[in-house]
Amino acid sequence: MNRVVVTGLGVFSALGKTTGEFEGALRAGRSCIAPLTIIPTDALIVKVGAEIRDYDPTQHFTEAKLALLDRFAQFSLVAAREAIVDSGVDFRGGPGHRTAAIIGSGAAGQTTLDENYFKIYSQGQKRLHPFTIPKLMINAPTSHITMEHGITGPSFSIASACSSSNHAIGVAFHLVRSGSVDMAVTGGTEATITLGTLKGWEALRVMAPDTCRPFSKDRKGMVLGEGAAIMVIEKLESAKARGAKIYAEIAGFGSTSDAGDIVLPSAEGAAGAMQACLTDGGLNPEDVGYVNAHGTGT
């Protein structure tokens, strides 16, 4: 089996519009949760979120291209551009046919859905844009990334709620490790700050009115945000051969299903996934120096 390494990183998020900005904000302990400005909040109980401030899509895409891109797809393309430039790979130069593109998203084109429901039910429009469906589909980011960069290997999207991008990276990792492909562009993207989406989350009564504090006894719930993070992964052998910068090695991946409550996770399921990951990577618990938790605060 091939060893798999990360050779390119790209981030476009509320916490930073590049990988460098994102890292700097993390190290400084900054928060990007603030009052929402991109949608009307009069009908909302929770009026805060992690939105990308001062985002102008025309700085990244032509008007013709924007007609095809939901907000969540826009973010993925911007992050993918940074990751691919960072990796130093030109996929059109040859490796594209041996490269996969696998992107995760739990919600897909919510902005497009919201806008078009408003046109139909509030404004009484009879016709919608002919590309409404391709624009909102969950595989839109993957498709646009492959077309923009000449990637012709396996490409698909994964939807598994908050685990979507993690599962996407895991599947991409297994494809590279097995030798099915040599490289992969993978990660996740979301743009969930729409009126309809927020009202749906409010109905679950899991939204915090101020901030997300998952490890506090005073936690009040979660806060929705938006953004994308993409990485380029490849065989260690090829990365060394081309003198690529290597950020990290992916040692293993594991996943499980709770098969229990519709919203309440089980400790056994999480423990099983972690054990599966350790086993897959040939590691012991004492080998782990950092754990990144999924802290919903609920």
Region locations from a protein language model:
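Condensing-enzyme catalytic core mediating Claisen C-C bond formation in acyl metabolism
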Residues: 3-7, 30-34, 207-283, 287-290
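Conserved beta-ketoacyl condensing-enzyme motif
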Residues: 6, 21-22, 27-160, 189-197, ...
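Short beta-strand segments
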Residues: 7-10, 102-104, 159, 184-190, ...
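Short acidic, glycine/serine/threonine-rich loops at helix termini
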Residues: 16-17, 112-115, 169, 194-200, ...
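Stable alpha-helical structural segments in soluble proteins, enriched in small hydrophobic residues
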Residues: 75-87, 168, 273-281
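Short loop segments at secondary-structure junctions
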Residues: 88, 179, 234-238
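Short conserved active-site loop signatures built around small residues
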Residues: 165
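Short, high-confidence coil segments that cap the C-terminus of an alpha-helix
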Residues: 181-182, 288
